[in-house]
Design a protein with these regions (language model features):
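Gly/Ser/Thr-rich loops at beta-strand to alpha-helix junctions
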Residues: 57-59, 191
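Conserved donor sugar-nucleotide recognition element shared by glycan-biosynthetic enzymes
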Residues: 34, 55, 78
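Short amphipathic alpha-helical segment that frequently serves as the phosphate-/nucleotide-binding helix
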Residues: 60, 79, 141
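Short acidic/polar alpha-helix capping motifs at helix-coil junctions
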Residues: 2-6, 24-28, 45-49, 76-80, ...
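An N-terminal domain-start capping segment
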Residues: 35-36, 75-76, 172-173, 177
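HTH-adjacent hinge/linker in prokaryotic transcriptional regulators
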Residues: 1-52, 63-71, 86-91
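Conserved phosphate- and dinucleotide-binding cores of soluble alpha/beta proteins
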Residues: 8, 82-206
């Protein structure tokens, strides 16, 4: 429409596609917001857990805020997150292999996905580019689909730290339905009406 809120498609309207932004630009934007989301997410961590942390700029802030004395094993496909976790005395780090996707600085593809299938994390903190109650989670790069799906499938609980600008948006490639998530963590100023749309799909919306 004239406001750029939706794009017209056959059979109806869907939300405007999110623009593609590379990791390094995302890493330096909305840092305070990402830190607030990260601090909320720390409440889910417990000693001796196996925690999968998918690559994203918000998840990087989460990794940086893991308490130094908390004993964990972190499984990740992100070099930035692996480096942040390596600075924690009690955190062991497992890095999944694969092809480096420079736009997200993550290892992707079938090699990464097949390695991820060997693990069953207690928690998965999934990187989210666009999420919508009807269209689920979508991403701009097709090579990320298999690793994200595998981490979701293998994990007991899937949590997403989501900048409010990503809510009710879509990108190019479908990863999963909204029901794949157990918890969605976002900022406190998200409207109650929007939260209801996600809670109606069975998510804890924090």
């Amino acid at each position: 429409d004239q406001k750029g809120q939706v794009k017209r498609v056959f059979g109806g309207d869907i939300p405007m596609e999110r623009p593609v932004i590379n990791f390094f630009d995302r890493e330096t934007t909305d840092v305070e917001l990402k830190q607030r989301l990260a601090l909320k997410a720390l409440d889910f961590l417990e000693k001796d857990q196996l925690v999968a942390i998918d690559g994203s700029s918000t998840n990087l802030q989460f990794a940086k805020n893991i308490p130094n004395g908390l004993k964990l094993t972190v499984l990740t496909n992100s070099y930035s997150i692996a480096h942040a976790c390596s600075m924690k005395d009690q955190v062991d780090v497992i890095v999944l292999g694969g092809r480096l996707l420079k736009e997200s600085m993550t290892n992707v593809g079938e090699t990464a996905a097949s390695q991820a299938a060997l693990y069953h994390p207690d928690l998965c903190f999934m990187g989210v580019y666009a999420i919508h109650p009807e269209y689920g989670m979508t991403i701009p790069y097709p090579d990320e689909v298999s690793i994200k799906r595998q981490l979701i499938q293998s994990s007991r609980r899937v949590i997403a730290l989501v900048n409010p600008i990503k809510l009710n948006t879509v990108s190019r490639y479908h990863v999963c339905g909204i029901e794949a998530f157990t918890t969605l963590i976002t900022d406190n100023d998200v409207s109650g009406e929007m939260a209801v749309d996600y809670r109606n799909k069975g998510l804890d919306f924090l």
